[in-house]
């Protein structure tokens, strides 16, 4: 490992990839494994217990490859902290310091407390377990997602964005994962095939509770992933005064709207990614 002089003195560099197992971070890992473009010592995943099953299957599929390559893997479980923050944490008003509510409720929106929890856990791990190193952190943000860099800008690691350096877009990252056999298949009884591919119906495979999902994504979840829609309804029932998408757009109101609109036929006419990959070869 190389050495770098900085405010902490001279420490050997330790190269960590911070991943979510979405298309960006997964494609970054696949490229790093295929070609030694950058050094990689460890992969770190902060698990909030709010990921789609298909996303965790991508993790399980790649872990043996990391082991074969001698790359360490660390998973930080903050699922209990996530639920505490969602339901029980006293939330203070930033101006007055007074407690004005209990629990953050929905993650996403203007208060990205879920992201804050993940970053806090990640950097606590770096400080506690890897303080003897200068951490070089690889983050799987694509070139058309550069604004996301700001969420990672205030921490003490040396940050690298390989996909931005390589000019990889989100669409290219998804396609690259498909070409390597990673499809984010989610089981469902809503279609005859018994499965859907998350990146065909969602823009991002983020936390299934995230209120940042757009109406198209939510409609697809309602019709194609009823098991996750039930979870959204349960959370909405726990916070009835906070509509998921704002006034007049609670999960229950959106359900009525989606039923009135009807489902989109095009959702069921799509060519599954595995078949599409064969056709394009």
Regions found by a protein language model. Give the residues of each.
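Nucleotide-activated chemistry modules centered on ATP-dependent adenylation/adenylyltransferase
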Residues: 2-281
């Amino acid at each position: 490992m190389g050495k770098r002089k900085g405010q902490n003195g001279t420490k050997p560099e330790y190269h960590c990839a911070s991943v979510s197992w979405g298309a960006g971070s997964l494609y970054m890992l696949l490229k790093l494994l295929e070609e030694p473009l950058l050094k990689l010592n460890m992969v770190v995943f902060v698990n909030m217990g709010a990921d789609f099953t298909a996303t965790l299957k991508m993790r399980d599929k790649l872990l043996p490859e990391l082991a074969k390559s001698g790359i360490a893997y660390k998973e930080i479980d903050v699922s209990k902290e996530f639920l505490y923050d969602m339901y029980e944490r006293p939330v203070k008003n930033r101006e007055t310091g007074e407690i004005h509510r209990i629990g953050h409720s929905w993650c996403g929106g203007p208060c990205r407390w879920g992201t804050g929890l993940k970053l806090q856990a990640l950097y606590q791990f770096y400080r506690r377990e890897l303080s003897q190193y200068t951490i070089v952190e690889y983050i799987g943000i694509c070139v058309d997602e550069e604004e996301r860099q700001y969420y990672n800008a205030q921490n003490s690691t040396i940050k690298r964005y390989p996909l931005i350096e390589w000019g990889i877009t989100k669409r290219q990252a998804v396609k690259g994962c498909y070409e390597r056999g990673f499809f984010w298949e989610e089981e469902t009884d809503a279609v005859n095939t018994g499965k859907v591919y998350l990146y065909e119906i969602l823009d991002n495979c983020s936390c299934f509770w995230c209120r940042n999902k757009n109406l198209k994504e939510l409609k697809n979840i309602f019709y194609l992933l009823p098991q996750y829609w039930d979870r959204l309804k349960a959370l909405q029932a726990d916070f009835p005064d906070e509509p998921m998408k704002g006034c007049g757009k609670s999960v229950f109101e959106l359900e009525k709207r989606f039923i009135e609109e009807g489902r989109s036929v095009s959702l069921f006419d799509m060519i599954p990614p595995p078949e599409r990959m064969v056709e394009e070869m």
